Design a protein with these regions (language model features):
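A detector for small-residue-rich transmembrane helices and their helix-helix packing motifs
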Residues: 1-156
């Protein structure tokens, strides 16, 4: 998480003020934690710790503020367009929430991503005009993922 934060906080602080960055960070953290609480409410043995939601909020804010950004994943030396990474990240996160077979805070990641997108729109409304493709893809993927989560939660 801190490695990701180190590389992407500068994108957000470049576009938003320092205070806005801090609010975005902590609000994404809280939203991620609240979603985790909702999803795992009936699982008394579930525990999580870390800044997953906050860091994911910063990452997705960066994707919106700089739609032409390219990312590289460890061991894959090929630049990936931000919107492709965003789709893959959300889909993997939804899979992880459903599978619950590892010790990763997928629900915090999802909540943080949603918080990062919403707060970025609040702070920089021009993102709607400058990042139409990225915003459309992230919102559509997030909506579909949200419906899948809701359906899975209601089946249990």
């Amino acid at each position: 998480n801190m490695f990701t934060l180190y590389f992407y906080f500068s994108f957000v602080t470049y576009s938003l003020r320092a205070l806005s960055f801090l609010i975005l960070y902590f609000a994404s953290l809280i939203i991620g934690n609240l979603l985790t609480l909702v999803i795992h409410f009936n699982q008394p043995n579930y525990s999580a710790v870390g800044a997953s939601g906050a860091v994911t909020g910063i990452l997705f804010s960066s994707l919106l503020l700089f739609p032409s950004i390219e990312l590289m994943i460890f061991f894959i030396p090929i630049p990936i367009p931000g919107y492709i990474f965003g789709i893959g990240y959300i889909l993997y996160t939804i899979y992880g929430i459903g599978a619950q077979n590892d010790n990763i805070g997928h629900s915090a990641h999802f909540g943080g991503a949603v918080g990062g997108v919403i707060l970025t729109l609040f702070y920089d409304f021009d993102v709607i005009y400058n990042s139409k493709l990225m915003l459309s893809i992230l919102c559509l993927t997030t909506l579909v993922a949200g419906f899948l989560l809701y359906g899975k939660k209601n089946k249990n």
